[in-house]
Amino acid sequence: MKQYHDLLRSILNHGAEHRDRTGVGTISHFGFQTRFDLREGFPIVTTKRVPFRWVAEELFWFLSGDTSETNLRARGVDIWAEWADEEHTAKFGRPAGDLGPVYGYLWRSFGGDYPEKNGVDQIANLLKQIRTNPDSRRLIVTGWDPRQAENVDLPPCHTLFQFKVESGRVLHCQLYQRSADAFLGVPFNISSYALLTHLIAHVTELEVGDFVYTLGDYHIYKNHLEQVNQLLSREPLPLPQLEINDPNRELRGLEGLLAARYEHVNLIGYQSHGKIAAPVAV
């Protein structure tokens, strides 16, 4: 996937060294945008193996409104484990496994009094607006609540996404991400929001269009530089295709979106180079 290689090279060629909250240090740059035409293939990195099932299960967990890392782990995904132990959650008076008002809560109960589900269901509102007012320029979901940003160990990195319905039939999505771990996080983020666009298009009976990816601070952790160079030495492979398995067209509207499971998505023809392991900066 050339766009991903371009992103990494942009940091290496133009970035500067920065200190960061983890103490690891980064090579960081600010401001990047790229575009993926979802009709030409599903954007997933091919120069290392990306566990697509983890991408999908995490997204379904977000959409459900759940914030329990224990429940995500039950789906076979442990990528939030570093922020879910008692050492991290006790700082906020929460038990181990309770991540607090992270993505799922903010998407489904924005402005609420955590853990009460008394906020705005942005996903429900989004689907309603796509159906009733597709020309709206307000098809927006935000994950950044200043009241809650200090109430979690890891406030949202991917902070706002907007949809546009073109000509009444094609759905585009743009994501703004305030902070992007280029080696570990970005491959997940690209595929997650591409999948979200496919799902939203399917349940609203639209076609997929473009996914536009806009970054604020995008960075390579210093202990990932060897892995980045290894990845860049590899040649990108052709992109796979994504199909939604819904032959009876049962997945419609909010209920359909929330009923979607990994078994409903089929990534066809994903070929990749081997896995490249790297430590998570906590």
Residue ranges and their predicted role:
Residues 1-282:
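Terminal, non-catalytic protein-protein interaction segments that mediate quaternary/complex assembly
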